[in-house]
Amino acid sequence: VAEVISMPDTAAAFARPYVVSWNLTYRCNLACEHCYLDAGPNKVKLPAFSDRSELSTEQCYRVIDEIAAFAPECVTILTGGEPLLRRDILEIIRYGVAKGLWVVVGTNGVKITETLAQLLQTESVRGLALSLDALDAERHDSFRRVKGAWENTVEGAKILTRVGLPFIVQTTVGAHNRHELAALAAFAHDELGAKVWNLYFLVPSGRGSYVSDLSPAEYDQVLGELAGIQRQWASRMLVNAKCAPHFVRTLLSEESPAPFPKSFTGGAGGCPAGTHYLGIRPNGDVTPCPYLPLFAGNLGDAGLREIWDTSDLFTRIRQRDHLGGRCAPCELKSLCGGCRARAYGMTGDVMAEDPLCTHQPGTLQSAVDTLKPADVGAVEYGQPAAAALRWEPEAKERMQRIPAFVRGMVTRAVESWCEKNGVAVVTATALEEIRAQMPTPKVFGTRDSR
């Protein structure tokens, strides 16, 4: 159950996205120096080179219809800019939830109040993602370029905890905070109540093109530290590296076990751009990754499924056999693939090697050779696994809280555990016992202590 399983490297693996990150607006109440969207106060329209405005409420409804038809129950992150600045944000959330999407709100947390948190809970938002980049207000506010941002975000997180809405804390690592990463993780969990701590590795895009201040060797050191933090918080808080698919190399290199799968089915692991993930810009432009300023089409001109299935950009970015530089011969390319947005931002070639990676191909071949096929194979997105055991109603209901793209695999894994342990009927108690043995906690999908 604890294994994370990558999809097979076949056309079926790319049938639908698991996650859609949708930038609803360029407007923002902060002016973060690393913003990939170059968002900020008073930005209503796109930059001067475009005559397209942000999508209207009705246009957003049509986009939601397309997402729901193409990728039922997919995780849909409504972000910005600051999405809570849109006057119609609750209407957009309500419509998305009604269509069966797993709606998550990506926000800086500054605008969260008790009233708003309760409204978001009423609208059945699955969770929120908040940004926090330092333990002290001065450094965070300097990075976010608005005085008082830290205090408001921290208070917003505490409000969410009181209301009972789960949330993620997002931190972008840099010279300003790399010395306090372990303390930031502890603060996110112990002081704020976060279910997840995501550490982002900067991608040179938007304003972020100008603020990278860590060398590849320093990033390697951070990844090593992050592996230790991940082990420290196992079973209490999920700890992830974001925009760092080569984290797999760090984990495979370690002699001591980390909460990462030492088995796989091969295929599209690592960077999910264009394989499991896509981004939508405020004007409807579609990209394989929000950090990648290359666009495969616009939803005003073509349907989402058509863009996903037929665009040259999506087709190209999936072809890991066509990667360049050190990524081409790398034994980890099916597990990693490098960050395509970083490759483009630093070289101008979306298929180039990831300049942040220091790995020399071939040096981990022996570790890769020891990997075995996963015990629980992939199940096509959204398809239920055929139940071999009887499930109690409460256990069935809980499974519906698990995202559709892994529900079939989790069902198989649960039944496999039950069969090995002589359990004939899947009960809520059995699920609790299984969950207690997992290296990472449950995150979204429940609002009570069960």
Regions found by a protein language model. Give the residues of each.
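Flexible mid-to-C-terminal extensions adjoining Fe-S/redox cofactors in radical SAM and related proteins
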Residues: 3-16, 291-383
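Aromatic/hydrophobic pocket-lining residues that form π-stacking "cages" and hydrophobic walls in ligand
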Residues: 63, 92, 96, 156, ...
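Radical SAM enzyme [4Fe-4S]-AdoMet core and its adjacent flexible, acidic
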Residues: 1, 23, 46-50, 55, ...
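Conserved alpha-helical substructure of the radical SAM core
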Residues: 2-123, 127
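Cys/His-rich metal-chelating microdomains
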Residues: 27, 31, 35-38, 274, ...
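Non-catalytic accessory segments flanking P-loop/AAA+ NTPase cores
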Residues: 381-450
